[in-house]
């Protein structure tokens, strides 16, 4: 522990306030914002595709729940990133964006990111049940029950936000470095009683969901391997066996892709939260504040990436998604062409009337 503390003490002075601001501009204002804009469009498309396919099965309902949490996560993180844009901060507005974003951007994003993790854990668990109890799973996890479970996930994960919103609000305060009185983050006199509680609860939710996804995915991969081997041995028709084998491999690749995306993108956040708990002064008000903020901004890149690339997974692995996706854009293209043709005809008609 002493060695770890010494390491952080040697690193922290290297990050000055000016350097921290540069890191925040690059990671938040540039990188995360760009990825987030793509993700917003991608998740809107995901939602439209799943609605067109129909929300009459537990799989589509689960994916819809994931798309909604991803969309809300990206909306809040986009606002968070805008709040650190120097042009916005120095504009003539009556509030200080880095202060206001805590309750309107940063904290809600943390909540929706945890919801995404738990919905992913549920989807992985559901797939695990499908391969373990294929004949009973449709009776166990009906569309109605899946919807109730997703609503429960949203509700439970939102509960840790209560202590934060009960002891903090947006109000007028004086900013000495600006020599202005602006709207900013203000704490109540009861703040000390719950300080850090929301952060702790979100950390616990993140660790548990992270482990749950890893465990369920590992079980699913093992079960798929067993099922694939059993089918190859027990099926006499080689062509049918090959079809089953391809289906199993496709499902396995989907699971591996989903697990890899989640594990890779959440690993930096897991390391970040671990550092907060084991390294003294590595927090928003501690000696290593700048290092804390730079690390948090770095983690936001991966949060944004995780919520933005699901459309690639669906499009690559699901032929049904690809078909609906192509139908959707074909419809949009036909409408555009029809609109352009109608405009041209109206223009020609107007020109003819003018000549007459």
Language-model-detected regions and their locations in the chain:
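Extracellular N-terminal segment of 7TM GPCRs
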Residues: 1-42, 85
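Loop architecture of class A 7-transmembrane GPCRs
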Residues: 8-17, 87-111, 159-208, 281-283
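Intracellular effector-coupling site of seven-transmembrane GPCRs
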Residues: 69, 186, 219-271
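Seventh transmembrane helix
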Residues: 212-213, 261-264, 270-274, 294-344
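Intrinsically disordered regulatory tails of 7TM GPCRs
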Residues: 1-15, 226-252, 285, 319-356
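Helix-to-loop junction signature of class
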Residues: 2, 32-36, 72-92, 113, ...
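Fourth transmembrane helix
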Residues: 72-76, 83-86, 108, 112-122, ...
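Extracellular TM2-ECL1-early TM3 structural module of rhodopsin-like
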Residues: 21-33, 59-124, 130-133
């Amino acid at each position: 522990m002493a060695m770890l503390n010494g390491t952080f003490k040697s690193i922290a002075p290297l990050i000055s306030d000016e350097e921290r601001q540069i890191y925040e501009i690059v990671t938040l204002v540039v990188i995360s914002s760009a990825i987030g804009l793509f993700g917003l469009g991608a998740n809107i498309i995901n939602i439209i595709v799943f609605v067109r396919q129909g929300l009459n099965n537990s799989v589509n309902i689960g994916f819809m729940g994931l798309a909604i949490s991803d969309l809300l996560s990206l909306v809040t993180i986009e606002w968070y990133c805008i709040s650190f844009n120097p042009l916005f901060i120095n504009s003539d507005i009556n509030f200080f964006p880095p202060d206001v974003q805590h309750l309107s951007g940063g904290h809600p994003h943390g909540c929706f990111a945890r919801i995404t993790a738990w919905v992913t854990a549920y989807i992985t668990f559901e797939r695990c049940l499908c391969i373990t109890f294929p004949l009973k799973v449709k009776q166990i996890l009906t569309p109605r029950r899946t919807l109730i479970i997703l609503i429960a996930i949203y509700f439970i994960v939102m509960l840790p936000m209560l202590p934060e919103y009960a002891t903090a609000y947006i109000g007028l305060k004086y900013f000495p470095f600006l020599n202005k009185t602006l709207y900013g983050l203000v704490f109540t006199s009861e703040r000390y009683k719950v300080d850090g509680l929301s952060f702790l609860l979100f950390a616990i939710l993140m660790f548990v969901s992270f482990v749950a996804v890893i465990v369920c995915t590992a079980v699913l991969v093992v079960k798929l391997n067993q099922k694939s081997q059993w089918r190859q041995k027990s099926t006499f028709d080689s062509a049918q066996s090959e079809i089953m084998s391809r289906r199993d491999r496709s499902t396995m690749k989907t699971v591996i892709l989903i697990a890899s995306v989640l594990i890779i993108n959440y690993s930096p956040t897991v390391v970040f939260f671990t550092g907060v708990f084991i390294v003294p002064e590595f927090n928003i008000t501690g000696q290593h504040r700048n290092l804390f903020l730079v690390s948090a901004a770095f983690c936001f890149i991966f949060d944004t990436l995780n919520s933005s690339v699901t459309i690639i997974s669906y499009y690559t692995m699901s032929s049904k998604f690809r078909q609906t996706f192509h139908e959707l854009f074909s419809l949009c293209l036909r409408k555009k062409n029809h609109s352009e043709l109608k405009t041209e005809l109206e223009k020609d008609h107007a020109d003819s009337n003018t000549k007459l």
